[in-house]
Amino acid sequence: MARIAGIDLPKNKHIDRALTYIHGIGLTSARKILDAVELPYTMNSDDLDGETVNRIRKVIEADYTVEGDRRREVSMDIKRLTDLGCYRGRRHRMGLPCRGQKTKTNARTRKGPRRGAARRK
């Protein structure tokens, strides 16, 4: 089992899909990484040898922010918005959608489960 950026890649998956288990790498980024190291997308993660894993690891460390650093970067961006007091920062602070969606009926993911009229007071 290959271990990259502190994450064990799943066995028996195509390598482009397996790389998406690393936080900060999506499918497009995974394919760009594989193009850089000249590997086919359809290669299974079981078939990776040590040298190939090291080449992938070097590309990721050089060009991408992943895992803990990425999470920290995102949380610092949100903290910066809230400190500025801009519209997006206020919406983050209130736990509401930031991108213009309506909130009268939907937005349950951000607002949490429904509360009855009695619990609201």
Curated annotation (Swiss-Prot):
What is one Gene Ontology biological process annotated in the Swiss-Prot or TrEMBL record? translation
What are the recorded GO MF terms, alphabetically? Answer: rRNA binding; structural constituent of ribosome; tRNA binding
Q: Where is the composition biased (Basic residues)?
A: 101-121
Signal peptide residue numbers? none
Q: Does the keyword Chaperone apply?
A: no
| PANTHER family per UniProt | 30S RIBOSOMAL PROTEIN S13/40S RIBOSOMAL PROTEIN S18, SMALL RIBOSOMAL SUBUNIT PROTEIN US13M
Q: Which HAMAP family match?
A: Ribosomal_uS13
This one is known as: Small ribosomal subunit protein uS13
